[in-house]
Structure formats: structure tokens, C-alpha cells
Amino acid sequence: MIKVTGYAAKHSYSRLKPYEFERDEAGAHEVEIDVLYCGVCHSDIHQVKNEWSNTVYPCVPGHEIVGRVTKVGPAVTRHAVGDLVGVGCMIDSCGQCEACKEGDQNYCGSPNSWLATYNGPMNPRAKAGGENIYGRDNTFGGYSNVLVVKEDFVLKIPAALRPEVAAPILCAGVTTWSPLRRWGVKAGDQVGVIGMGGLGHMAAKLARALGAEVTLFTTTPEKIEEAQKLGFKAVLEKDKQAFEKLEKSFDFILSTVPEKHDLNPFVALLKQDSVLAVVGALEPLAPLDNMSMAQMRRSVAGSLIGNLAETQDVLDFCAEHNIGPEIEMIRIQDVNDAYKKVEKGEVRFRYVIDMASLKEEIAGA
């Protein structure tokens, strides 16, 4: 067994604190990773606070992980000691269902769904034969110094990407990339992005690199200014005049807002046969005006993270096009304060934990 130190929440109202636990040694098809960086995702906060009612405690968050391979199992062929690698939201799936066979591990149809990098199976209450099919009820994520992961769920970090910049691409990047590719965004398309946070600004950068014309929708003048600094057109959500001018203008709209909000004003902006995809909010949204949708044959759809191939694809695309998230580096000791700032929308645009700060804490203990 490997002795590991991480930061964990013990219950829904607790601060993240140092937590010691053990991981299994790398098996035949697994790699051991020295964690270098881990992004802070809004879903980390949702899970720590049990806002989706599926958290298993103790909860060690973190699924935007970049590190270096330190050991490999005897059957590993995809990675070698010394490789710079990444781990995103998943560390396993059943591999047998139709979705998995098609390469869509993120839509695994097994009773437990896919195995999350932290907080156990995506559906921890489902049982197959009385037990979770993965043989475990909890998993611990990247807010820790060591990770052990099945080689197929480990991504290669391109040399052209700074490792700390690569970390958020493993969730925020692929979560926005997957719907952009699924609905065929291409050069010349008019694309709207709702929200100017960690996901929103990445979606805008990726869509622009695909050749689309991008408009960001946000809620404050400050965020309008931020969007313009990044070279994007931006519209205040409360500007009714601007919305009227933009009716039937967009080929695709992506909503990245991580909470309940009204999509109806944005549906009216879609052209005929166009799609508004939601990636930010997993809770119920405001009711949709089906008349507006039916009259123009518009669609509202959902999308959940991305599969492994899409994750490697977006990493490579970002490296090729020199794209990356805007990040702020923090020490792990400051993660609780970082959570508060994320909730207030004060981060520009993604916090990344320098895990050297955890190693310094361990060494000084």
C-alpha cells in the first residue's frame, strides 16, 4: 500500500483539511503518478457541499490532474516512467456497454455509470449483485500527492502545453470541446457562449480557434470588459435591446452557467434547426417555451464532460493552436478561500493548485 496525503472534506459543511489515506500499489495495467498540479473545478465545490446529493465522505476532490509517471505495472504499454500525463473526470468504466464500446465512456450504461476520479461511482447508490461493479464505494482525487490510475484513463500532455495550463483542459476544456465537436461548429458559424467563467472563456477560445464568430453573454459590466480584453464580443444578459437585434442569429449556443437559469431568452437567438447545449448546470432549469422551439425546430440539449478520445484531442488541439485557460496559481493551504472566491465569481478564470505546496507541508510535518 502507498501512504498518501491529501485535502479532504469530512462532511458537507466542513473545510478541506489534511487527510491521510492509502492507495493500492499500481496493478498490472496501472500507473503511479506524482501529482504536480490540480485545477479547481466548480463541481469540486458542488461535491464537497453535497449539492448534488451523491457525495461520499470523506471527499478528496480534484479531477483536473497533471503529474509525472513514477511507476508502471508490468503490462502497461501506453506510458513510461517520466512521462508527463493527465487524469480527468473518469478513472474507469464498464467497457462492456454500447456507449463504452463506441468510445463514449462518459455515458457508460452500467448500473453505477463510470467511475469518477473522486467520490466513487457516478451513481454510488446503484448496486450490481449487491456490490458496486468497481469493487469500491469511494475514490480520492487529485488534491493529493500520489495517484494510481488504469493506463487507459491516463492522457498524454503535449510538450507544447505548460503542465499547469493543461490541468483545467482535462475538465473545463473537454466539457466545452465535446459539444462544439458533437454539433459540428465550423469556420464562419455564429456561436454564443453563456457565462464568462472557467468553462465559458475556454469555450469561447476553442470556438474561435475552430473559425467561429463568438459572442459571450454575461451578467456584469466587469465581465464584459474581461471578454473584450480576450478579444470577444460580449452582451449583458439584461440588455433586451441587444437580444432583440440578435434574434435568429446563432448557429450554436453553449450554456456554461453552473446554476439554475432561464434559457428561453437564448433559445430565441437560435437560427432554424440550431442547438443550445447545456454543460454548466446539472440541476433542473426553468421551464422551456416549447412554442419558440417548435416554430423554428430548435433544440435544447445536454452534454456531460467528454470521452477519452475527445480529451486527448482537445489537449492536442490546444497545443497546436497555442490555446489555454487563464489561470491563477494557489497553494493547497489556500483552497478554502479559493472556493469562496469561485462561488462569488471572483476568479479569473481558473484556479490551479501547485501541489509542491502539499509536498512542502508533508516534509515539514
For every predicted segment, state its role.
Residues 1-2, 209, 308-365:
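C-terminal hydrophobic helical "lid"/dimerization subdomain
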Residues 37, 88, 254-256, 355:
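Short, well-ordered coil/turn residues at beta-beta hairpins
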Residues 24-38, 51-101, 105-106, 114, ...:
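Glycine-rich beta-strand-centered segment in the early N-terminal region that forms part
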Residues 94-194:
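NAD(P)H dinucleotide-binding glycine-rich loop of Rossmann-like/cofactor-binding domains
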Residues 270-271:
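Helix-to-beta-strand junctions that scaffold the AdoMet/dcAdoMet cofactor pocket
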Residues 280-297, 308-314:
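Rossmann-fold NAD(P)-binding glycine/threonine-rich loop
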Residues 274-275:
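Glycine-centered, small-residue-biased loops immediately flanking beta-strands
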Residues 187-196, 201, 205-263:
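Adenosine-nucleotide cofactor-binding segment
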